[in-house]
């Protein structure tokens, strides 16, 4: 069972942006795909830090 939290909403939005940017997929915490997605892990980290600070 998965419980709804703001973190899931943030990740969903970032995953959507990742797909639109041409990324292939995310596997084991690393981005696999085109070079344009190299900074995607940094975006996830920043979003997660913002969610943690908001608590």
UniProtKB/Swiss-Prot annotation:
Q: What is its EC number?
A: 4.1.1.39
Annotated GO MF terms: magnesium ion binding; monooxygenase activity; ribulose-bisphosphate carboxylase activity
This protein's record includes keyword Disulfide bond: yes
- Can you quote a single GO CC term? chloroplast
Described by its record, this protein's role is as follows:
RuBisCO catalyzes two reactions: the carboxylation of D-ribulose 1,5-bisphosphate, the primary event in carbon dioxide fixation, as well as the oxidative fragmentation of the pentose substrate in the photorespiration process. Both reactions occur simultaneously and in competition at the same active site.
**Which amino acids does the record list as binding substrate?**
19, 27
Cite the InterPro entries for this sequence: RuBisCO_lsu_C_sf (IPR036376)
The reaction(s) catalysed by this protein are: 2 (2R)-3-phosphoglycerate + 2 H(+) = D-ribulose 1,5-bisphosphate + CO2 + H2O; D-ribulose 1,5-bisphosphate + O2 = 2-phosphoglycolate + (2R)-3-phosphoglycerate + 2 H(+)
> PTMs?
The disulfide bond which can form in the large chain dimeric partners within the hexadecamer appears to be associated with oxidative stress and protein turnover.
Q: Does the keyword Disulfide bond apply?
A: yes
SUBUNIT field: Heterohexadecamer of 8 large chains and 8 small chains; disulfide-linked. The disulfide link is formed within the large subunit homodimers.
Q: Which residues carry out catalysis?
A: 18 (proton acceptor)
Superkingdom of this entry's organism?
A: Eukaryota
Q: Which cofactor(s) does the record list?
A: Mg(2+)
Compartment list: Plastid, Chloroplast
Can you name the source organism? Vitis sp.
BP-aspect Gene Ontology terms: photorespiration; reductive pentose-phosphate cycle
Induction info reads: By E.ampelina infection.
Similarity-based family? Belongs to the RuBisCO large chain family. Type I subfamily.
Question: Cofactor note from UniProt?
Answer: Binds 1 Mg(2+) ion per subunit.
UniProt name for this protein: Ribulose bisphosphate carboxylase large chain
Task: Give residue numbers for the site Transition state stabilizer.
Answer: 34
- Which key words are in the record? Calvin cycle, Carbon dioxide fixation, Chloroplast, Disulfide bond, Lyase, Magnesium, Metal-binding, Methylation, Monooxygenase, Oxidoreductase, Photorespiration, Photosynthesis, Plastid
Remaining remarks:
The basic functional RuBisCO is composed of a large chain homodimer in a 'head-to-tail' conformation. In form I RuBisCO this homodimer is arranged in a barrel-like tetramer with the small subunits forming a tetrameric 'cap' on each end of the 'barrel'.
Taxonomic classification? Eukaryota, Viridiplantae, Streptophyta, Embryophyta, Tracheophyta
